[in-house]
């Protein structure tokens, strides 16, 4: 079964790579990105100049310029569907990242766990979680911690507060600032700098985790049971993923109400491609560059979420078998479909993981 899963994860990674890079390259998306970079202006903002210096390193600044152009339409809010897709992506990644970090801390010592966390985080920022997350699960598909040892080597040392605080400070807080509209609430100059600085969030995450481990948490490592700490981390990831998915789902329903009733109350939603990922193309009012970003984000998030769901479902089934519990596959499929619709794919993966952790749940799955 592990070998089959490994091939599934690798297939997902290759699919993501093809759709995010090869297909978009053939469709001219990266040429559009290069052309926009050559204009030295931000997308949709002909009067706002693109910053040319962020770190003082010319090669690195060139990469950051492309990244700022990439993230500007998503964070600025001109295109509602694109921004909502970015919101769903960002919130969903919190749940996925919590699952990955907890798994890393569970099977490694704190130092090695932080090194691996840093490598995985930088890799996913460089090429996208849609490629890196399936590859990570493919490489670690055999590394399952024993059910009897529920505490995490890394998380036990840093507590749930270390993981949650690190995620809030390194990822969520800069993301909120980055999403403020310019120039209404933040200057375009500052917004570009925040977008560039946010790209290093995996580094900030590891630094905050290490600081918490070394200086803050030494005096109260046993303040909560290990299992409760793990569940707190999962609940945090679930809440972030679910809330962002519900925001997107509400906008989707509103846009469909508008299209059916021809009401003018939701006119601002319908033209911007608020659609189920992968099924619909962005609407006609999206520019070519924004349409490419829409497609890139959809494949990046959906493949990462699908890989995490496959891994979580396999983990859940393995734990049920270990507890000698029978699984009603038809009922499980129906529950998964309902959770995916209401909670979102990332939150569904987190829900499966936390339910597989509790012996009390395994003894009474109803």
From Swiss-Prot:
The membrane-spanning stretches of this chain are 9-29, 84-104, 113-133, 162-182, 195-215, 233-253, 291-311, 333-353
CC per GO annotation: membrane
Induction of synthesis? The onset of expression occurs at 48-hour-old stationary cultures and the steady-state levels correlates with the onset of aflatrem biosynthesis at 108 hours.
Record's bilayer topology term: Multi-pass membrane protein
The record describes the protein's role as: Aflatrem synthesis protein A; part of the ATM2 gene cluster that mediates the biosynthesis of aflatrem, a tremorgenic mycotoxin with acute neurotoxic effects. Synthesis of geranylgeranyl diphosphate (GGPP) by AtmG (a GGPP synthase) precedes condensation of GGPP with indole 3-glycerol phosphate, followed by epoxidation and cyclization by AtmM (a FAD-dependent monooxygenase) and AtmC (a prenyltransferase) to produce paspaline. AtmB is also essential for paspaline production, but its exact role has not been identified yet.
User: Would you say which domain of life the source belongs to?
Assistant: Eukaryota
Q: What is the organism field in this record?
A: Aspergillus flavus
Read off the lineage from the record.
Answer: Eukaryota, Fungi, Dikarya, Ascomycota, Pezizomycotina
Q: Molecular function (GO) terms listed?
A: isomerase activity
Protein name as catalogued: Terpene cyclase atmA
UniProt-annotated location(s) = Membrane
Gene, per the UniProt record: atmA
Q: Which family does it belong to?
A: Belongs to the membrane-bound ascI terpene cyclase family.
Q: Which UniProt keywords apply?
A: Isomerase, Membrane, Transmembrane, Transmembrane helix
Q: What is its EC number?
A: 5.4.99.-
Q: What is its main location?
A: membrane
Q: Key word Transmembrane helix present in the record?
A: yes
